[in-house]
Amino acid sequence: MKTSGSQSTLKDRLLLVVAGIVIAFTGAAGAEVDVSQSPLFVGSNVPGNLALVPSVEFPTVISVANLGGFTTGSRYVGYFNSAKCYKYNYDADETKRYFYPVASPAPDASFRCNDATLWSGNFLNWAATQTIDPFRSAMTGGYRVVDTPTTTILEKAVGERVNTGNFPRRTVTGSTVIAGVMASKWNKVMIRIDGLQNKMWITQDLDLGGNTNATGPRYEYNPSVHALDGSCLERTGRQCDRYDTDAVFELSVRVKVCDNAAGLEDNCVKYSQGYKPEGLIQEYSQRIKY
């Protein structure tokens, strides 16, 4: 009797469950409503919300952005404009040293400036850009170290570790190639970024060192003094004690952008007193809350 009663009770429960399911589906079908498959908004004037959780730690911040050797005619990404030539502004105050674009001449079709006083923006992108720099440029317009109403200067990311695996030392050979992209007449240039914070070292013949010290003397590059053409740096009487090919030169990797006199970059936006570089965050700031 117990077994029969238990089976009867179980059947009754199953019937109730099935009946409930049928009723639920029947009711749902009778009250069917079209629901938008697009994201729902409170109103047309209310911006959406976006949470950004980027992974931009080691080694992304300090790794090299433009891989491989330098190839004339290839375009490289970075804070510099590949379609512009630059001069270097030297000042006794290191924070006031930077590259700035010139209105003329413009690079040729292979991004070469071919001028003993000019640097190719495309070459500087290849030489000095860390992976985080294009990311910052795309998101915010770049890392501003000078940000006044009329002047904007961007600075490369900090290269804090001595590690050639993340940012290899670079070498470019050939006086013709170098003369087209640097303010130099050397026949070879070796470049170091790793461990130098916001700076770059260049030399023709010296070892760039395994830590923060090179194997030879280091000079703060001043274009009005240093021609980078094999000329003499130090003399004793008529005797030249050191040529510029046997020295290391230090440059600060900063660049002036959105200079209307030299031509604006594509991401420059007009403000009341000048132009500023913007990225996706500024572009969509009126439509999205971050």
Predicted regions and their residues:
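Bacterial N-terminal signal peptides
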Residues: 15-25
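N-terminal secretory signal peptides that target proteins for export/translocation
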Residues: 1-11
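Extended N-terminal export/anchoring regions of large proteins
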Residues: 28-290
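Short N-terminal leader segment in a subset of presequences, especially plant chloroplast
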Residues: 9-13, 40-41
